[in-house]
A protein has these predicted regions:
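Hydrophobic positions on the alpha1 helix immediately C-terminal to the Walker A/P-loop
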Residues: 28
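N-terminal phosphate/diphosphate-binding loop that engages ATP/GTP or pyrophosphate donors
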Residues: 34-101
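Small-molecule kinase domains that catalyze NTP-dependent phosphoryl transfer to phosphate-bearing small molecules
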Residues: 80, 125-131, 141-144, 148, ...
C-alpha cells in the first residue's frame, strides 16, 4: 500500500510536545520531525547536558547559587546529523552518550527545577523556534517556552506502562535496571516535575491530551500526525 502524504502546509510553525518522563515524547517527536521535514529539539537533552556538567564538577544539583555560578562557563551547543539525530555539545565536546547514563536523570530533574537554569536556556530554545519550524518536547514547552505554538500536545501514559518502556530502552542501551527501581524513580520524578516552583509540569489549557498507554509506537505516531495535520490546515 502506498504511504499517504502528510499534507502539512509549507509555512513556519511550531509543535510543542509536553508530558511526564517516559511518555515517549522524544521517540515520537523525532519520528514526526522526520516525517514532516522539520527540526526536532529535545529540550530534555539540553537539561541533561547541564546536569552532566554539574555532576562532573561535583556540585549539589539543588544548590542554585553554586549551579548559577558555573552557567557562564558553559557553552551549550547542538549538532544535527544527516538523519536528524541531535547531538549535544558541552564546551565543544560531544556528550550525547554521557548525558544518557541513568545517574544523569536525577541531576537533570534537579537542575531543571532551578529558575536560574530555566532562564539561562529559555532564549536559546525560543531562538531555535524563531529560526526553524520545530517540534520541541519537554515539560513546559506549551506553557512557558512556546506559549504561542500553533500545535500543543500533552503526551502521557500510565506510570506502569512508562516504566516498562523505560526498562526496555535501558536494556537496549546495555544499562538494564530492575522494573521496581525504574517505577520508583519515575514516580519520584513525576512528583518533582509537577510540584516544582519554576514551570511545573502541566498541560497547557489549549493542549490536546493524548494517552498512549494502550497504543504502540506506530499507532501513537499516526494519531499525533493526524492531530497536527488537523490543527495546521
Amino acid at each position: 500500500m502506498r504511504e499517504m502524504q502528510t499534507m502539512i502546509p509549507e509555512k513556519h510553525y511550531a509543535v510543542a510536545v509536553d508530558g511526564p518522563s517516559g511518555a515517549g515524547k522524544s521517540t515520537l517527536a523525532k519520528a514526526i520531525a522526520a516525517k514532516l521535514g522539520i527540526l526536532y529539539v529535545d529540550t530534555g537533552a539540553i537539561y541533561r547536558t547541564i546536569g552532566y556538567a554539574v555532576k562532573r564538577r561535583g556540585i549539589e544539583p539543588r544548590d542554585e547559587a553554586a549551579v548559577r555560578a558555573i552557567l557562564p562557563e558553559l557553552e551549550i551547543g547542538m549538532r544535527y546529523e544527516a538523519d536528524g539525530e541531535q547531538h549535544m555539545l558541552l564546551n565543544g565536546q560531544d556528550v550525547t552518550r554521557e548525558i544518557r547514563l541513568p545517574e544523569i536523570s536525577m541531576y537533570a530533574s534537579a537542575v531543571s527545577a532551578l529558575p536560574a537554569v530555566r532562564a539561562f536556556l529559555l532564549e536559546m530554545q525560543r531562538d531555535l523556534a524563531r529560526k526553524h519550524s520545530v517540534i520541541m518536547d519537554g515539560r513546559d514547552i506549551g506553557t512557558v517556552v512556546l506559549p504561542d505554538a500553533e500545535v500543543k500536545i500533552f503526551l502521557t501514559a500510565s506510570a506502569e506502562v512508562r516504566a516498562q518502556r523505560r526498562c526496555l530502552e535501558l536494556e537496549q542501551r546495555g544499562t538494564p535496571k530492575p522494573y521496581d527501581e525504574v517505577l520508583r524513580e519515575l514516580n519520584e520524578r513525576d512528583y518533582n516535575d509537577s510540584h516544582r516552583a519554576a514551570a511545573p509540569l502541566r498541560a497547557a489549557e489549549d493542549a490536546m491530551v493524548v494517552d498512549t498507554s494502550a497504543l504502540d509506537f506506530d499507532a501513537s505516531r499516526e494519531a499525533l500526525l493526524a492531530l497536527i495535520r488537523e490543527k495546521l490546515q
